[in-house]
């Protein structure tokens, strides 16, 4: 890790640079450690259906099955959400106001097109 970057971040947050976490691990390693001693015990899957999109899906299913807690935030009951201990319903793009940046780098305003179902929350609300 870059010491200058760590010093900058620690100054902004008012913490000792040594208290900042180190580099993370690749997603494949993270999933392989799920539910094992010293590994991840709980996981929030956000915006992904890993039971369909991850390589070696059977291994991923087994790994997530070892977790103490699996939380999935999604706007429909995906294969991954079906296996979750908790499913947090999120808004679809047409159900929220905001902005987006397209592939050209243009910032576009998005207006709500339809009302969201009761109980659904924005992903920002869930993360906060």
Please annotate each region the language model reported.
Residues 1-128:
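Non-catalytic alpha/beta scaffold blocks inside enzyme catalytic domains
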């Amino acid at each position: 890790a870059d010491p200058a970057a760590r010093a900058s971040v620690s100054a902004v947050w008012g913490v000792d640079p040594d208290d900042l976490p180190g580099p993370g691990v690749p997603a494949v390693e993270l999933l392989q450690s799920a539910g094992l001693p010293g590994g991840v015990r709980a996981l929030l899957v956000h915006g992904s259906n890993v039971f369909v999109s991850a390589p070696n899906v059977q291994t991923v299913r087994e790994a997530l099955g070892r977790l103490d807690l699996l939380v999935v935030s999604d706007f429909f009951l995906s294969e991954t959400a079906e296996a979750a201990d908790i499913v947090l319903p999120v808004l679809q793009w047409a159900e929220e106001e905001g902005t987006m940046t397209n592939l050209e780098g243009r910032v576009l305003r998005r207006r709500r097109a339809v009302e969201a179902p009761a109980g659904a929350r924005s992903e920002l609300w869930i993360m906060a």
